[in-house]
């Protein structure tokens, strides 16, 4: 194990310069024993600060944490979301994101964590990203259309706050609108994790829906499945598929491979 300490200067609201400290432990890579992972999802505001979960996680002493998405919800913090203007939307998100840090920060001080955004993290009730395209204006309350509701600047803030500690992306080239990507590989404890997004590149139901009502709700069995099973539709996207083809062939220093996503 190695101890670490981060010092950072900050000028407070009174103009005073202060030095703040953040310290913890970087634990030895657990390559000689079975890896213990704790996986969490959907941190809804009614459970904040999730004390029973945190208490049990401390008791279990996992080697690594996995937060698979919805680290924030629109209702978190007791205040509604603000979609615009852009900077207000970003501050609105950050306030809710800080609450996630307050709840789980002490654990993450000493335990490595994988964190991946999902739909609610970018203020959507469902997300069919279409490779990063924008949603048509005036459709913020429709959960069955392809694209991102919020601006790319805000989405990039979400991606940076939640994923910047991960290994570098397999292919860092931004997608539509200049949106950052974060799909990557992490080896820990002789386990190789492929970390992907099954939301960002996904085609939307509006491309196939020929039924009444919500486009993402099939209420009657389809007579012809070819309507929704077309070669031009994407789930993980070609770029992530190329990554997975490379990842699955490399078994150097690993015993098992695990694919991490949000909601297949």
Can you name each region flagged by the protein language model?
Residues 1-264:
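Metal-dependent phosphoester/phosphodiester hydrolase catalytic core
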